[in-house]
C-alpha cells in the first residue's frame, strides 16, 4: 500500500499531468500587419455572402492581420493540397489556417485519402516553419438534418499527430444554427462573422495575439 507521502506525491503528479494534457498548443506572437493564409473551400471563400462578408475579410477587421482568402468553392482536400505551394510562395504567410474536408465528406471520398491529404498539407506548411491552425469540419450525416452537427474525429487525430492547434466547435455551431447559415452546408454573413470572432479569440488563447 502507498504511505501518506507517496499518495500525496502520486495525486499531485496526476493532477499536474491532467492539467498539462488539457492545455492548448501555444504559438509565438505574430506582429500586427502580418500576412495569414486561410486555406479552404466554400466556407472560407464565403459562398452565399457579399464581398467583405467572408470570414477572412471579417477576421482581417477584427485582428489587423492581412488575412488572405485562399478558399475555393467545391475544393476537396486533394485540390487544396495542389493549390497550396503557389499560395505559400506568393504570400509568404506567418500562419496558415487549414479548414478543408467538407467536400470530401459530402462526396463520400475515402477517409484515408482525406486524412492523408490534410496530413500532407500540414507537413508542407511545417516544412517552411510556418505554424498551422487546423479547423475541425462537421461530418455531414442524416443527423445534421435535425440540427445535430458533429465534427469528424479525424481532425483530433491529425492535430495530435502533427502537434498543431485545433479550433473545434466553430463550424459545427454555425451549421447547427438556422440563424447563422444560408443552407445546410454554408454560413451566412452572421455565421461567417461568428466564425471570425471565434478564430480571433482562439488567436488570443494560443498566443498569436497577446
Report the location of each language-model feature.
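Domain-scale detector for complete catalytic domains at protein termini or as standalone homologs
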Residues: 8, 21-29, 119, 134, ...
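Serine-esterase "nucleophile elbow" of acetyl-processing enzymes
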Residues: 21-92
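Catalytic-site microenvironment of enzymes
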Residues: 5, 28-35, 63, 190-192, ...
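Alpha-helical cap/lid subdomain in secreted, periplasmic
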Residues: 61-62, 82-210
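N-terminal secretory signal peptides and thylakoid transit peptides that target proteins
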Residues: 1-15, 21
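Short, motif-level signal for alpha-helix interfacial/capping segments enriched in acidic residues
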Residues: 17, 21-23, 166-167
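Conserved Rossmann-like nucleotide-binding pocket used by diverse enzymes
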Residues: 16, 68, 133
Amino acid at each position: 500500500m502507498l504511505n501518506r507521502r507517496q499518495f500525496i506525491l502520486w495525486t499531485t503528479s496526476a493532477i499536474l499531468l491532467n492539467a498539462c494534457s488539457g492545455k492548448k498548443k501555444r504559438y509565438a506572437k505574430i506582429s500586427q500587419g502580418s500576412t495569414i493564409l486561410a486555406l479552404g473551400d466554400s466556407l472560407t471563400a464565403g459562398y452565399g455572402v457579399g464581398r467583405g462578408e467572408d470570414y477572412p475579410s471579417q477576421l482581417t477587421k477584427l485582428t489587423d492581420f492581412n488575412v488572405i482568402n485562399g478558399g475555393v468553392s467545391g475544393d476537396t482536400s486533394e485540390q487544396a493540397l495542389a493549390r497550396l505551394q503557389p499560395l505559400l510562395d506568393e504570400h509568404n504567410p506567418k500562419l496558415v489556417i487549414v479548414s478543408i474536408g467538407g467536400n470530401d465528406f459530402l462526396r463520400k471520398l475515402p477517409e484515408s485519402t482525406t486524412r492523408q491529404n490534410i496530413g500532407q498539407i500540414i507537413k508542407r506548411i511545417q516544412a517552411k516553419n510556418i505554424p498551422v491552425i487546423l479547423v475541425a469540419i462537421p461530418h455531414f450525416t442524416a443527423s445534421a438534418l435535425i440540427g445535430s452537427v458533429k465534427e469528424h474525429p479525424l481532425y483530433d487525430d491529425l492535430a495530435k499527430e502533427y502537434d498543431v492547434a485545433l479550433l473545434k466547435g466553430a463550424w459545427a455551431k454555425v451549421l447547427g444554427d438556422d440563424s447563422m447559415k444560408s443552407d445546410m452546408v454554408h454560413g451566412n454573413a452572421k455565421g461567417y462573422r461568428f466564425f471570425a470572432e471565434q478564430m480571433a479569440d482562439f488567436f488570443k488563447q494560443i498566443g498569436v495575439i497577446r
